[in-house]
Protein backbone atom coordinates (compact mmCIF):
# COMPACT_ATOMS: atom_id res chain seq x y z
CA UNK A 1 0.00 0.00 0.00
CA UNK A 2 2.75 2.52 0.92
CA UNK A 3 4.45 1.97 -2.45
CA UNK A 4 1.19 2.80 -4.27
CA UNK A 5 0.71 5.92 -2.14
CA UNK A 6 4.24 7.15 -2.83
CA UNK A 7 3.78 6.42 -6.54
CA UNK A 8 0.57 8.48 -6.48
CA UNK A 9 2.26 11.39 -4.71
CA UNK A 10 5.12 11.31 -7.20
CA UNK A 11 2.58 11.36 -10.03
CA UNK A 12 0.94 14.43 -8.46
CA UNK A 13 4.17 16.41 -8.03
CA UNK A 14 5.68 15.44 -11.40
CA UNK A 15 2.90 17.28 -13.24
CA UNK A 16 4.57 20.49 -12.00
CA UNK A 17 8.17 19.53 -12.78
CA UNK A 18 10.92 17.17 -11.73
CA UNK A 19 10.09 15.80 -8.28
CA UNK A 20 11.89 13.69 -5.69
CA UNK A 21 11.23 12.29 -2.26
CA UNK A 22 13.28 14.54 0.02
CA UNK A 23 15.70 11.73 0.90
CA UNK A 24 16.35 10.72 -2.75
CA UNK A 25 17.68 13.82 -4.49
CA UNK A 26 20.43 12.98 -6.99
CA UNK A 27 23.71 14.90 -6.71
CA UNK A 28 23.46 16.08 -10.31
CA UNK A 29 19.96 17.53 -9.94
CA UNK A 30 18.76 20.07 -12.51
CA UNK A 31 16.83 23.17 -11.47
CA UNK A 32 13.99 23.81 -10.91
CA UNK A 33 12.89 20.79 -8.92
CA UNK A 34 10.42 19.81 -6.21
CA UNK A 35 11.01 17.69 -3.12
CA UNK A 36 8.36 16.28 -0.82
CA UNK A 37 8.21 14.54 2.54
CA UNK A 38 5.51 12.97 4.64
CA UNK A 39 4.86 13.79 8.26
CA UNK A 40 3.74 10.25 9.07
CA UNK A 41 4.29 6.64 8.13
CA UNK A 42 0.69 5.86 9.07
CA UNK A 43 -1.47 6.35 5.99
CA UNK A 44 -4.83 5.97 7.72
CA UNK A 45 -7.06 9.00 7.22
CA UNK A 46 -5.33 12.35 6.76
CA UNK A 47 -1.57 12.85 6.53
CA UNK A 48 0.37 16.12 6.49
CA UNK A 49 3.00 16.46 3.78
CA UNK A 50 5.18 19.33 2.66
CA UNK A 51 6.91 20.05 -0.58
CA UNK A 52 9.76 22.41 -1.36
CA UNK A 53 10.39 24.08 -4.68
CA UNK A 54 13.97 24.97 -5.62
CA UNK A 55 15.09 27.32 -8.38
CA UNK A 56 18.55 28.52 -9.35
CA UNK A 57 17.71 32.18 -9.83
CA UNK A 58 18.17 35.65 -8.41
CA UNK A 59 14.40 36.05 -7.98
CA UNK A 60 11.49 34.04 -6.60
CA UNK A 61 9.50 34.30 -9.84
CA UNK A 62 10.00 30.68 -10.94
CA UNK A 63 9.38 29.31 -7.43
CA UNK A 64 6.19 31.38 -7.17
CA UNK A 65 4.92 30.27 -10.59
CA UNK A 66 5.39 26.57 -9.76
CA UNK A 67 3.87 27.09 -6.30
CA UNK A 68 0.81 28.77 -7.79
CA UNK A 69 0.20 25.76 -10.06
CA UNK A 70 0.40 23.37 -7.10
CA UNK A 71 -1.82 25.61 -4.96
CA UNK A 72 -4.42 25.93 -7.73
CA UNK A 73 -4.61 22.16 -8.23
CA UNK A 74 -5.00 21.39 -4.51
CA UNK A 75 -7.33 24.26 -3.62
CA UNK A 76 -10.52 22.22 -4.21
CA UNK A 77 -8.90 18.83 -3.64
CA UNK A 78 -6.97 16.88 -6.26
CA UNK A 79 -7.94 13.20 -6.61
CA UNK A 80 -5.21 10.66 -7.40
CA UNK A 81 -6.37 7.15 -8.22
CA UNK A 82 -4.16 4.45 -6.75
CA UNK A 83 -4.49 0.69 -6.74
CA UNK A 84 -7.12 -0.17 -4.13
CA UNK A 85 -8.30 3.37 -3.46
CA UNK A 86 -7.48 7.02 -3.93
CA UNK A 87 -5.65 10.00 -2.46
CA UNK A 88 -7.10 13.48 -2.23
CA UNK A 89 -4.60 16.33 -1.90
CA UNK A 90 -5.77 19.52 -0.15
CA UNK A 91 -4.04 22.69 0.98
CA UNK A 92 -2.57 22.77 4.47
CA UNK A 93 -1.59 25.77 6.57
CA UNK A 94 0.29 27.88 6.03
CA UNK A 95 -0.21 27.28 2.33
CA UNK A 96 2.99 28.77 0.89
CA UNK A 97 6.09 30.27 2.46
CA UNK A 98 9.33 31.64 1.03
CA UNK A 99 12.41 30.08 2.66
CA UNK A 100 15.61 32.13 2.98
CA UNK A 101 18.61 30.18 1.68
CA UNK A 102 22.26 30.70 2.60
CA UNK A 103 23.17 30.11 -1.06
CA UNK A 104 21.91 33.34 -2.63
CA UNK A 105 21.81 31.76 -6.11
CA UNK A 106 19.12 29.28 -5.01
CA UNK A 107 15.55 30.26 -4.21
CA UNK A 108 13.24 28.04 -2.17
CA UNK A 109 9.59 27.99 -1.17
CA UNK A 110 7.52 25.36 0.57
CA UNK A 111 3.88 24.32 0.57
CA UNK A 112 1.99 22.44 3.26
CA UNK A 113 -0.56 19.93 2.06
CA UNK A 114 -3.00 17.48 3.61
CA UNK A 115 -3.50 14.12 1.93
CA UNK A 116 -6.63 12.13 2.65
CA UNK A 117 -5.92 8.47 1.96
CA UNK A 118 -8.76 6.07 1.23
CA UNK A 119 -7.72 2.48 0.56
CA UNK A 120 -9.59 -0.81 0.77
Locate predicted features.
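Charged, amphipathic alpha-helical segments and their flanking helix caps
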Residues: 1-20, 27-31, 35-120
